[in-house]
Amino acid sequence: MKRTIAIVAGGDTSEFHVSLRSAQGIYSFIDKEKYTLYIVEMHGLDWHVQLPDGAKAPVDRNDFSFVLDGEKVTFDFAYITIHGTPGEDGRLQGYFDMLHIPYSCCGVLAASLTYDKFACNQYLKGFGVRIAESLLLRGGQSVTDEDVMEKIGLPCFIKPSLGGSSFGVTKVTAKEQIQPAITKAFAEAQEVVVEAFMDGTEITCGCYKTKDKSVVFPITAVSYTHLRAHETELH
C-alpha cells in the first residue's frame, strides 16, 4: 500500500512564492508509483490541499487530514518545503510532533534556534565559536549612524534576524545607507541585526539522517557568482 505524503508549502513570509516553487520541484522528483503525493498550501489559517483537478480541499488542523470523494485522507509523512515561518522556525515541527506525524527536517529546538540569526550566534559564542560583532534592534528601536560606525564599522550587513532568501538584507558600504537599510529590514521582521562584514571563504557542509544512518556531504565553498545570479533571479 502506498504511503500518503504531504508536501507542505507556502508560509507567512516574503518567501511564500519561493516555497511554492520548491514544492513543485519536490513533487516532480518523487516517484508517484511508490507514493501518493499532495501539495498542502498554508497561508495564515488558510490550509488547503491542491487536488489533481485544480480544486482545493480544506485541511482539518485537528488531525492534519482532508476529505476526498467523501473519504477522510490522512498523511503518513510531511515533507516541509516552507521557507520561513511556520516551516523553518519550529512551529510546524511542534505541530507534527503532537500529531505523531514524521517530517523531513530538524526538530523544534534546532529549527527555532537556527531561524533566529542573533540568538543562534549568541548560542554558538557560548561554545567558543568566533562570530562577527553585531547589534540587535527590537521593535523599531533606533540606532544612530555614529553608533553603527563606532561599534560595528563599515562595511556591514543589516538584515532581519528572522527570515531568509536575502529578503530585507543590505550590504552597507556608506554611512548614508544605514537608516534606509534598517527600515528595509524592519519591513520583514520585528528584530534586526547590524553585523560586521567578514572577509573570507565561506564553506558549508550539508547532511541528512534516515532511520538507519546519517550521511554527511563533502565540504563545499560557496560561490558568490552563483549567489548573485540566484538573488537576481529571485528578486
Predicted regions and their residues:
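ATP-binding N-terminal substructure of ATP-dependent carboxylate-amine bond-forming enzymes
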Residues: 1-104, 108-109, 113-115, 119, ...
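Short hydrophobic/aromatic-enriched beta-strand-loop microsegments
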Residues: 102-106, 131, 215-216
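Single conserved hydrophobic/aromatic residue that forms the stacking wall/gate
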Residues: 226-229, 233-235
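Glycine-rich beta-alpha junction loops
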Residues: 44, 141, 162-164, 198-202, ...
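Short, hinge-like loop/turn segments at secondary-structure boundaries
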Residues: 54-57, 122-124, 151-152, 210-212
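Active-site nucleotide/adenylate-binding loops and adjacent lid/helix of ATP-dependent enzymes
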Residues: 3-9, 13, 21, 113-201
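Short, well-ordered secondary-structure micro-motifs
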Residues: 49-51, 206-207, 228
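Short, solvent-exposed loop/turn segments that connect beta-strands within catalytic domains
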Residues: 71, 211-215
